[in-house]
Amino acid sequence: MIDAHDIRFSYDGPGGRRSLNGAKLHVAPGELVAVLGHNGCGKSTLVKHFNALLPLQHGTLTVDGMDAADPDNRWALRRKVGMVFQNPDNQFVSTIVGEDVAFGLENYGVPEAEIPARVAAALAAVDMAGYENRATHTLSGGQKQRVALAGVLALSPDILVFDEATAMLDPDGRQEVLHTIHRLHTQQHKTVVMITHYIEEAIGADRVYLIHNGKMIADGTAREMLTQPE
């Protein structure tokens, strides 16, 4: 479903310091894949290519058969790949939960009459049914992150990418979000890519990639990663 080969990227342009230096990755349909590495190693830069948030400078990347280098695929990729980022507050566009989840649906061609049902279904999928009229400032960190996820789910993406989605949460919030991620993977058969620097968050993944200085240096099961020599 996702095939990335020799991805190289520099925020300063092709001749600048590389954030990615030949990264490669394969994600099969229905897999839960974790990308593990320290801060600044290129994890987030890599996954922002999946839905064309960053342009492809070098290498090849296909997502469900679509060439990420083709600008005509940009909006299709953004509907195919839903992303949840680190800080839920930065993802809110409204102070009301239901309005936030509904934001942008019309721009993606969802008929206005369908939007309330989409919002309700997305909130139910993250165990927040009935929260449509709640103020976002009354929510816990874990609840805010699940609302952000509901906004992604309302577009029915086939692939979910979580970019350090638990990094700013307390232990209870982390567990709420991790439980939701694994439930969506197992019950709704979503393909999931989870970016993290916590090995314990990668334990339940089908496969783990270890990235260092913009390049994959190992991949395997979480157990294999735990037994890798330093």
Spell out what each predicted region is.
Residues 36-38:
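The feature captures the beta-strand-to-loop junction immediately N-terminal to the Walker
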Residues 113-131:
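Conserved ABC ATPase "signature" region
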Residues 59-69, 77:
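Conserved ABC transporter NBD signature motif
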Residues 51:
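Helix-to-loop junction immediately C-terminal to a conserved catalytic motif
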Residues 160-163:
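Catalytic Walker B motif of ABC-type/P-loop ATPase nucleotide-binding domains
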Residues 215-230:
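Conserved beta-strand-loop-alpha-helix hinge in the C-terminal portion
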